[in-house]
Regions:
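FAD/FMN-dependent oxidoreductases across multiple families
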Residues: 168, 177-287
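Long, low-complexity C-terminal extensions of enzymes
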Residues: 248, 252-332
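Conserved N-terminal helical subregion
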Residues: 35-105, 118
Length: 332
């Protein structure tokens, strides 16, 4: 839903959807997290703005001819590689001068936005509960009910989790896992057996965050600033939040970039990261799974997480309830 802010500012309509094979997304279905047979659903609702009962009625009956209008009730699923050239053309229309060249980030003559992804990411390890480090992805033809699905599905396994993301013309599938417990070939074999996938894209990643993402000369955004893990697409949210925070703070500081600005930006961003880390930790820390070496390693850190657990202030009661109802641990 946070991407609505971005798309509504950039595009006049949703014609880009067909160009990127995009579909609407109204909720996320998480299977196998509390235990191997569990299932929980997170509608894209927010009890700070929505009537939750009305929201659930709308999204669970949503289809192509019945799209909820509420601002926080849907997101999009798309092929991002097809969106890139559309955004480039839109930038040109808006008068942005695109320069393609290698940049020296030690250069202090101009202010630069660091979008280098993992190449620009160092810093603190996210959490001992979040140990995945690799994703393998691909596309397959529609199967079962995926042409009628308006949600993303994840399925926790003995090492990480699968995902299924229906698009207009195919389904994005893949696996996030810890390379300590399976080889690349083993995961590819599982994906082939599960989905018939035979063309693979491997994406190693680092689960880290920078405490200092803004300086007098650079601003890190996206996975150059932080990467929690692919679950719940938090990096997309953080990109939008980074840009919005920077814009609003510039206005508050009368477009003056100084030491005080840098200090407050970094404090705000760090708080945002830590809040979302707690949310992501909950999937692992509140689960009772201990049926494999992967889950046994995570289990070593659950007690500390549960004993010290506090929900971020801005998560609505509905989200808290969905998380605690979906998983077998209940907050004291």
């Amino acid at each position: 839903p946070y991407m609505r802010f971005f798309f509504e500012k950039v595009f006049d309509d949703e014609s880009w959807m067909d160009q990127t094979n995009a579909t609407y997304k109204f909720y996320i279905k998480h299977d196998g997290w509390a235990n191997e047979n569990s299932s929980m659903i997170f509608p894209l609702c927010d009890d700070r703005f929505d009537d939750i009962e009305e929201c659930e009625r709308e999204i669970f009956s949503a289809d192509k001819n019945n799209v909820p209008e509420c601002s926080s009730r849907h997101a999009w699923q798309m092929q991002s590689v097809l969106l890139q050239p559309i955004l480039i053309e839109k930038c040109k229309e808006l008068g942005v001068n695109l320069i393609e060249e290698n940049y020296d980030f030690s250069n202090t003559d101009i202010f630069a936005i660091d979008c280098r992804g993992f190449d620009g990411l160092g810093g603190e390890v996210i959490s001992p509960l979040i140990i995945n480090d690799t994703a393998i992805a691909g596309h397959v033809n529609h199967f079962k009910d995926t042409e009628q699905r308006y949600y993303t599905r994840t399925n926790a396994t003995d090492n990480g989790w699968f995902w299924e993301i229906p698009l207009q013309n195919k389904v994005g599938v893949g696996r996030v896992y810890c390379s300590k417990y399976n080889t690349e070939d083993e995961i590819k074999k599982q994906l082939n057996e599960q989905y018939g996938l035979d063309t693979f894209l491997k994406v190693p990643f680092k689960t880290k965050y920078k405490e200092t993402v803004c300086t007098m000369h650079t601003l890190k955004v996206g996975s150059a600033a932080a990467f929690i893990e692919p679950l719940e697409a938090t990096t997309l949210l953080l990109v939008v939040y980074s840009c919005y925070l920077f814009k609003e703070m510039l206005k508050s500081f009368s477009f003056r970039l100084d030491d005080d600005f840098v200090k407050h930006y970094n404090l705000n961003f760090k708080q945002m990261i830590q809040n979302h880390i707690v949310f992501m930790e909950s999937f692992y820390g509140l689960s009772d799974r201990n049926d494999s070496p992967y889950w046994n390693e995570i289990d070593k850190h659950r007690k500390q997480f549960r004993d010290s657990h506090e929900w971020p202030e801005f998560y609505g009661e509905y989200i808290k309830k969905k998380m605690y109802d979906g998983l077998s641990y209940n907050i004291k």
